[in-house]
């Protein structure tokens, strides 16, 4: 598999610059990444220490769903007074988040969630969280498990523009090819452009 046909929508990030990029990014965003948990499995968690990010995992035990549609969430409170009720919506302060190191199949799963929550009546809380999120996927050069079936369900191992990712990282050995998947990602990456270079034409 080679880079997207739209090479003007792709950049190169040298691996030695990745940590510096993420360190600066964490000043502006809450960073969620795959990390090794105490039980020995991998979880998508808030990143406090960049050294805990682990990209050599197969799948995480949790999914993106819990960040956008948690099992429990307080959405309003109410007061009963003189036989009537007053509803007080909870004005949740939603952080801007970057989800880094995602598998292609997990990103495609979010597309199905988006479709469901786009139906009327729209879930405004879901979209409040979703619109403040950037999804950065890592294409699988090799399936992490023999049981993976993403090829048959068209959920990976590589994604095309419009298939859910904002940025897609493809491992090219010493470098990452970084593909831009959305207009939102194009705006997102502008403050960090100094970490990226244009790809060599030979990659096409």
Segment roles from a protein language model:
Residues 5-204:
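Iron-sulfur-associated redox domains of electron-transfer enzymes in respiratory
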């Amino acid at each position: 598999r080679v880079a997207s046909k739209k090479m003007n929508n792709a950049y190169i990030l040298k691996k030695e610059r990745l940590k510096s990029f993420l360190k600066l990014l964490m000043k502006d965003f809450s960073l969620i990444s795959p990390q090794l948990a105490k039980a020995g499995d991998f979880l998508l968690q808030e990143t406090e220490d960049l050294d805990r990010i682990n990209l050599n995992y197969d799948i995480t035990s949790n999914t993106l769903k819990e960040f956008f549609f948690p099992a429990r969430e307080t959405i309003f409170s109410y007061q009963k007074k003189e036989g009537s009720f007053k509803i007080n919506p909870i004005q949740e302060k939603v952080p801007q988040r970057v989800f880094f190191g995602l598998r292609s199949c997990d990103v495609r799963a979010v597309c199905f969630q988006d479709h469901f929550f786009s139906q009327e009546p729209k879930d405004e809380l879901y979209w409040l969280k979703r619109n403040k999120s950037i999804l950065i996927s890592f294409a699988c050069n090799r399936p992490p498990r023999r049981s993976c079936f993403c090829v048959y369900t068209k959920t990976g191992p590589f994604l095309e523009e419009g298939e859910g990712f904002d940025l897609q990282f493809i491992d090219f050995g010493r470098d990452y090819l970084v593909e831009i998947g959305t207009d939102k990602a194009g705006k997102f990456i502008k403050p960090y452009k100094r970490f990226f270079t244009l790809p060599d034409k030979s990659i096409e």
